[in-house]
Amino acid sequence: MIPITALKDKTVALFGLGGSGIATAKAIVAGGARIIAWDDNPDSVARAQSAGIATGDLRQADWSQFAVFVLSPGVPLTHPQPHWSVDLARAAGVEIIGDVELFVRERNHIAPDCPFIAITGTNGKSTTTALIAHIIKATGRDMQLGGNIGTAILTLELPCADRFYVVECSSYQIDLAPSLNPTAGILLNLTPDHLDRHGSMENYAAIKERLVAASGTAIIGIDDAYCQAIADRLHGAGIRVVRISKEKHLDRGYFADGAKLLWAQDGEIDEIASLEGIGSLRGAHNAQNALAAIVACLSAGLSLEEIHAGLKSFPGLAHRMEQVGRRGKVLFVNDSKATNAEATAPALSSFPQNIYWIVGGVPKAGGINSLTAFFPRVAKAYLIGEAAAQFAATLGGAVPFEISDTLAAAVAHAAGDAGNDAAPEPVVLLSPACASFDQFQNFEKRGDAFRDAVLALPGVMPMRGES
């Protein structure tokens, strides 16, 4: 735990008592502050009370006593409309912050020079965060991993000079962290997302920009117009910007050419790494993730040799192009995290052909219409869930398909068909391009069910992160 000593002897209001909210409340109290915490869910309030956290309805509180108001990132700050607690804080002139801001202030207070790498972007941030953490940890350095990736940031160990922090930040967390100042900040990409919470794409992009704007080194993917503009703007403001691209050959910066990762400067181009044979980093989207990780680790003082070793041993993340197993030459890949067509596109682009594609669930707007360019790579599609009829109409005569209905049936049929394929490496790919809620609690449960079904097949050899 990181006790928040910067608030010692002050009184703090807190709203949102989920897992990170309770962890935040405990850290505030451990630092010597008083707290009054609340949540709209009575069960959450009861859990906090049983954990020894002082609670009270903030609608009845005297807001003049509060030094700050700590808001959980899942609670609306601005859109679609501010939560009632936000309105009360603003009316009283009380500053509104989140748990990442508390970490930043405590780090600034007790160990301002400790390495702090923060990662954001619409897609790829969890993989990039996990990859950086893996590379650093593999060298034997003291590494702490947290934030939006699933570990509440204030549950980490106390900041000190030689302890590395690798923190994934959502737009909600950045919006509540005005002092965010990582030694290296990464902005991977920007596409429309969470606009219900930010009001417009421009607002969303402006929030994401804050993470890199105050970074010692701003590492920015420039393959979309928003990030390109941010990189140009920050460079013009005198900030150290390192550009990365998975699509463009750069005159200055880091870019991918297939599996080769290259560095260009002053007319010279050097190969700095290769992802050839690293199954957990297959695909152009992972080339971008790897480029960001390499630059961040170099900026933190790691050697290329250390980075290469970490890349090769990276196991990948569950449900994100996770290599589950092999049966003979057939590879089974779990990409259950792909809950829309935009997220499925990198998976389909990662294999040149002979894809046995399991797709479906609760469809998003546009369905799989945007994926038609990848249809020639698909040997057969196996349609599951509510989207089956809609996707069958989209596939038409372009791709052979069957309506499998259930994931278990799809796995069995796809495994059989792929096993009869004469290609060198047919792949059974779960990349649903849909939400999971028609058949599963969440994408994790769907991915677990896929993994279980694959590993139950006769002759399957389990694997994780191998080529």
Curated annotation (Swiss-Prot):
Gene Ontology terms: biological process: cell division; cell wall organization; peptidoglycan biosynthetic process; regulation of cell shape
Enzyme nomenclature, EC number: 6.3.2.9
Keywords, sorted A to Z: ATP-binding, Cell cycle, Cell division, Cell shape, Cell wall biogenesis/degradation, Cytoplasm, Ligase, Nucleotide-binding, Peptidoglycan synthesis
SUPFAM superfamilies tied to this protein: MurD-like peptide ligases, catalytic domain, MurD-like peptide ligases, peptide-binding domain, NAD(P)-binding Rossmann-fold domains
GO MF: ATP binding; tetrahydrofolylpolyglutamate synthase activity; UDP-N-acetylmuramoylalanine-D-glutamate ligase activity
Primary site of residence: cytoplasm
Annotated disulfide bonds: none
Reactions the enzyme catalyzes: UDP-N-acetyl-alpha-D-muramoyl-L-alanine + D-glutamate + ATP = UDP-N-acetyl-alpha-D-muramoyl-L-alanyl-D-glutamate + ADP + phosphate + H(+)
A Pfam family assignment: Mur_ligase_M
Pathway entry: Cell wall biogenesis; peptidoglycan biosynthesis
GO cellular component: cytoplasm
Matches recorded under InterPro entries: Folylpolyglutamate_synth_CS, Mur-like_cat_sf, Mur_ligase_C, Mur_ligase_C_dom_sf, Mur_ligase_cen, MurD, NAD(P)-bd_dom_sf
Cell compartment(s), UniProt: Cytoplasm
Similarity comment: family membership: Belongs to the MurCDEF family.
UniProt xrefs under PANTHER family: UDP-N-ACETYLMURAMOYLALANINE--D-GLUTAMATE LIGASE
Task of the protein: Cell wall formation. Catalyzes the addition of glutamate to the nucleotide precursor UDP-N-acetylmuramoyl-L-alanine (UMA).
Full protein name: UDP-N-acetylmuramoylalanine--D-glutamate ligase
Name of the encoding gene: murD
